[in-house]
Amino acid sequence: MAHSNQDPHCPEHRLYGNSSRKIHVDGTLWPLRVGMREITLSRPYLSGGQEFTSFPIYDTSGPYSDPSVTFDPEKGIPPVRDGWGFIARESDRAAATAPEGSMTTRIPRKAKEGSGITQMHFAKKGVITPEMEYVAIRENQRLEEWTLSHGRGAVHATPVTPEFVRSEIARGRAIIPANINHPELEPMIIGRNFRVKINANIGNSALSSSIAEEVEKSVWACRWGADTVMDLSTGKNIHTTREWILRNSPVPIGTVPIYQALEKVGGIAEALTWELYRDTLIEQALQGVDYFTIHAGILRRHLPPAEKRLTGIVSRGGSIMAKWCKANGKENFLYEHFEEICEILETYDIAVSLGDALRPGSISDANDEAQFGELKVLGELTTAAWQHDVQVMIEGPGHVPFHMIEENMQKQLEYCHEAPFYTLGPLVTDIAAGYDHVNSSIGGTLIAFHGCSMLCYVTPKEHLGLPDRDDVREGVVVHRIAAHAADIAKGSPAAWLHDELMSQARYAFAWEDQFNLSLDPEKARKLHTESLKAAGHTGADPDFCTMCGPDFCSMKKSKEAKTLH
């Protein structure tokens, strides 16, 4: 079917890199082609004894920035992982035919009987999978030579190797969320010894949004730098919405399965059952969901202290399970059946994101008995999941004052055995409505510096409504800044070089290079053009400073002073 902007199921998908080109780096262990974008610079810049006429950047946009790839959003993007042959060799068919409602004819896969299929399983056996080599190449950004020679600002000036990736996964300090039924995925890694990652939340609700809008938002989030996307749909057509998102997503997709389970019982939390939830897990596993948020750590003993809070339980999944426990007078069935949950996860290599059902919803509730009590249970569940070779990350707060953030990271490392931490912010104040994306990025920078592996974005609509396309862009870019700032502080050579090239371009008045090296080139270019017009300047003089005018530019005068004797 031809693409049509009039067709509500065909949102505009094609995205191109801004003044950059798509490049691919070949694997040496596996037949991989790892996509990156390369920015062409207007002049050579020197750093660490090397000359740079271009700069390769980490690219989360998949085929959407590759003009050589053609695709139909109703059929999905190319299944790149199928070409590596590893999954087909190591797994069996999970069904005779494609599931009902599938957009493709691909038969879902599962682990072979009595054998493992997870990245942790292979890592413990000493096997480097295609996904491990892929993420090592991505993390290096084709800057291995410069990394080895780099000293200033870098703490760990050593290129990432596939073996290092394998060892981190084997130890549980990093995960590659990559369901064997998501062949469109371009693998990425989440761990504190790697680039800090960003997650974007999307999803319809009973109040608004269509399938097409959510697919477009997921692609849009990838365009601006989201490393993973969570589909938090709670409205109609949850299964179909998820299928469209998965088949068109080059990044890992996460879900909160309890949302769909709740929809199946008409929104009545106390009517939920383990059997219904189990079937929902399997349904989503066969579709290809890469990680599940599961609120298995909230127990009945945590409810009394939670009820004393200023803002109670603010996690949707947490409030659902709290109501179920109280209404039925029983322990959380997600906790009671966690071993069975892990058996499902290990069958398809789905990572578990252990949900923080008791995250604080206000700074008054931060670091309280309920929050840290649940965190200890999440540590117990982590070791249980590792017994099944299931990859684990831990979800964290939430609303936490700036001076109390480091304690969260320290306790998470202690209680949860160094499993990756994934936080919503933290938001450092409660009064930033309309600007909570900035609020979140402040706390996010600090906790990422202390070791948090992935930041969940917050948009300007946080606490106010569902984000639209512009909100998604704003939220992703602001949190990309936070993650990048933490990467610099942690000693990332690639992050340091990116900033150094920008500073050289700024000093040289190389405006196009400044735009292209920024995280939002379109906005930077637009604001500069508006400033030129406001100053009545044509732009013919490249040294004209739109900040200071012709007579007060410090960089211009600094360069002039250099010529004086």
From Swiss-Prot:
Q: What is its EC number?
A: 4.1.99.17
Query: Superkingdom, according to UniProt?
Result: Bacteria
Cellular component GO terms, alphabetically?
cytosol
Residues that coordinate or bind substrate = N201, M230, Y259, H295, S315, R316, G317, D356, A357, L358, R359, E395, Y422
**Ligand binding (Zn(2+)):** H399, H463
Enumerate the cofactors the protein uses: [4Fe-4S] cluster
Keyword S-adenosyl-L-methionine listed? yes
What chemistry does it catalyse, as a reaction equation?
5-amino-1-(5-phospho-beta-D-ribosyl)imidazole + S-adenosyl-L-methionine = 4-amino-2-methyl-5-(phosphooxymethyl)pyrimidine + CO + 5'-deoxyadenosine + formate + L-methionine + 3 H(+)
Q: Does the keyword Transport apply?
A: no
Q: What class of enzyme is it?
A: lyase
- InterPro entries in UniProt: ThiC, ThiC-associated_dom, ThiC/Bza_core_dom, ThiC/BzaA/B
Co-factor note (free text): Binds 1 [4Fe-4S] cluster per subunit. The cluster is coordinated with 3 cysteines and an exchangeable S-adenosyl-L-methionine.
Q: Where is the signal peptide?
A: none
Q: Which UniProt keywords apply?
A: 4Fe-4S, Iron, Iron-sulfur, Lyase, Metal-binding, S-adenosyl-L-methionine, Thiamine biosynthesis, Zinc
Residues given in the record as [4Fe-4S] cluster binding sites: C545, C548, C553
Question: What exactly does this protein do?
Answer: Catalyzes the synthesis of the hydroxymethylpyrimidine phosphate (HMP-P) moiety of thiamine from aminoimidazole ribotide (AIR) in a radical S-adenosyl-L-methionine (SAM)-dependent reaction.
Q: What is this protein called?
A: Phosphomethylpyrimidine synthase
**Which organism is this protein's natural source?**
Chlorobium luteolum (strain DSM 273 / BCRC 81028 / 2530) (Pelodictyon luteolum)
